[in-house]
Each structure stands twice: as C-alpha cells, then as structure tokens.
C-alpha cells in the first residue's frame, strides 16, 4: 500500500471526533484522580505545594526536571548565555578561532562545575581513544570505546572514577554520567572516523574541540564527528534565508513547552500516581490507559525541551544538530522508536547499518539488533529492568520484519492485492494500532516500573477484555489513521517541492 493512499474526508472526520472524545474522557478521569489523591500520605514526597491561591499542588516526582528549572536554572542560563556571547564575539573578531573558543569555554565550564580532576579524567579517556585511532583499526577503537563506556557503568571502576568529581551537589550524579558517557561516544566516533578517513589526518586538537563543545557536553544530543567537524570548520558560515526566524520560533516553542509542563503538573499527577499501585488500580480503564500513554508523552516532551534549548544555541553557532525525537503519538512502528536522534544516528552509523545492511534479511537484522541493543544496554547501565527493556524492544523490531516477510508471502500478498488501496490502509492501520500499544508497554517498563506495567497490561488485556480492549484498540486505530494522513500530506508536499526544484 502506498503512503499516498487517501481516505474519505468524512471517515477522517469521524476518526478525529472519536480520538478527541476519548482523550477528553481519559483526561477528565485523570484530573479527578489527581484531585482525589492530592492529600494522600503516599503522595506527600512527590506532590508539593504549588499554586496555593487556587489550592493546587504540583507533581515534583521528576527530580531532574525540578532541578533544571529551580536551583540549576540560573546556572544553565548563565553558562549557555556566556557561550553564546563569547561565540558571537569570536565570530566577529577572529572567526578562524571560533572552534577553539568553543573548546576552551567548554573545558573551563566543565572544570568549574565538576572540578579539575574530573576534567583530567576525561582528557585521559580522550587521549586513550586518540592513540587507538592512530593504529587505524576500527575494531580496536570500538572495543576500547565500549570498554571505556563500561568503566563508567560498572563497579568498581565507576565508584573510583566518580571520586574525581570535586564537591557534592544535587545534579552531580546526572552530570557525571552524562558528561562521561557522551565523552566516550564522541571519542569513539572520532576514532572510527579517523580510521575510515586516514587521509584527513585528524588531530588531538580536533577531538578536544569536538568533545568540549558545551551545549552538547552533558546531555547531548551527539553529532558524529564527521558532521560536527565539517560544520564547525567553516570560517565564514552563512545563514540560510529564514534561519533566524526558525531559531526564534524554536526558542519560543521551548519556553511554551516548559510553561505547559508546569501548568500540566499542577492538575495531572501522572508521575506520582503510578507509584501508588493501590490507588492506580482504582482508576477507570480509560484513565489508566491515558496514564500509561501520558507517561511516554511526558518523556518525549522532556527530551524535546532539553534538545530544543540546546539545539537553539547550536543553531546560533551555525551548526545543524540532530532534531528532537519524533513524538510518541506518531510512532506506530518500532523502527522509528527512539527518544534521542543523536544516539540513534550514532548507533545506526557504526553498528546497526554496518551489520544489518539493507535490513531486509532476517538473520543479519537479528544480529544487528542484538548488537545495537547490547550497546544500548551498556549505555543505559546494565540492570534487570534495562535487560528486560532491551529484550522487548529488540524483539519488537525483529517481529516487525518477520510480519513484513509474512505479509509478502504468496497467499497473504494475494489477499492484500485483492483489497482496495483504502481497505489495505485500514488493515495496516489496525496492525499499527496493536504495535502502538506494544511500544507503549515495552517502554513503560523502563520509564516507570515493571509492577505498574503489569497492572496496565492486566487491566487492559485481561480483566477489561473484550470491551476495554477493543475500545482502546479502536481509539488507537483512529489515531494511527490520522498519523498516516499527516504522513500522506507531508509526502505530497515533499513531492511538489521536488517537482518545483526540477529544471524545466
């Protein structure tokens, strides 16, 4: 079935009406549950005073989000504003030294935040992978990179290396793991690109400029070295038409998203409710499904805000960073499921595509996904819940290929060929709806807890069968059809754009 297959406008209107009504109904259930549970003893630690003048408390269960926009807000603004200011001055006065300014400012910021010994620790890892790159053996560079990453994820080395951080503060562990892990991935990218292009003679200075670019340092996203080096080496970068307007719009959207999350957390305690399973079990089925869905949406919003702020600064520096992740609402295939495009690009370039090739053969695809999720497990930090998450998502990615091969099998292919293109789209959307909930359940394991995931699965699939199960499946089907319609519109717009660009 082609992506350009259209459905009747009345049918799409019905889907929109059903989806809007279902979301409103689930939202009302969550709002009532949040109001009822605001004063529960189990909520005292994570539901704190908020808008007292209207009697609303605030969900503060996400430690990182609260720290970013309270105690560390001014530090973040000061550090990024200083970076933008010095970058602008350097671009005006000495554009050839622009990349050096990025590295020096970033290194000083890291040293001021984490201490000089931590900076020396990272320099040691950088030098180690630089030396490995001189040998020109990709397998050695990747192996050493993974060993370095493991040293930041497993005891006793992680405990020893964390001792290099000076002082103690709230976000110390988050910054330590973020800065260290991203440093290893960047250094590994540098080493692999050096092996792939020995004629370019990359230097240690190039690696340091790449690694200590402050906006990307602690939280990413990660750009592969070849892309970063090509963009940052432009002596006189030129902005595209309308680029500044796009940067301002991106910054504005980030501010709006931050305000929206703040407002949302005063009315919906979506992060706190799952911690009290007895209370969560009393929710209506629709509200429970909405709670599971909203947990993934929030994680996407959190990533989009983080990368939106960082990418705004990077765009001011004339870089083209990885875009924020695709909204979870638009994901109904495992192949597009990722919450960090930078890490996804890194894994695809150096592992997944290298092993899987065209991703059309079952055995190479299985090997590629196993290798990719093995590295992802190491990146996230090996533990039981991460093992389970990796297994489920690895299975989901391969299961999609198996189903695709099955659909291409003679009898099934002939059955689909006998259907109209509209009916084929409807059948595929039905499978997409089931896949959508598989994505939610598989990722809810790591974003929340295994017990909460078991509760959702039991209520929606067992005790709620068939009424709840089929109702939620139909609502999801409506959503998938609307996503497909959006994809169809974008494909047509892209085709028209390409036609206009063709010489007459």
UniProtKB/Swiss-Prot annotation:
GO biological process, one term: negative regulation of N-terminal protein palmitoylation
Oxidoreductase keyword on record: no
Expressing tissues: Heart-specific.
Keywords: Endoplasmic reticulum, Membrane, Transmembrane, Transmembrane helix
Subcellular location: Endoplasmic reticulum membrane
One CC-aspect GO term: endoplasmic reticulum
Disulfide pattern: none
Keyword Metal-binding: no
Top-level taxon in the UniProt lineage: Eukaryota
Ranges that cross the membrane: 12-31, 65-87, 100-122, 127-149, 251-273, 288-310, 429-446, 461-483
Membrane association type: Multi-pass membrane protein
Function: Negatively regulates N-terminal palmitoylation of SHH by HHAT/SKN.
Family note: Belongs to the membrane-bound acyltransferase family. HHAT subfamily.
Subunit structure: Interacts with SHH.
Protein known as: Protein-cysteine N-palmitoyltransferase HHAT-like protein
Organism from which the protein derives: Homo sapiens
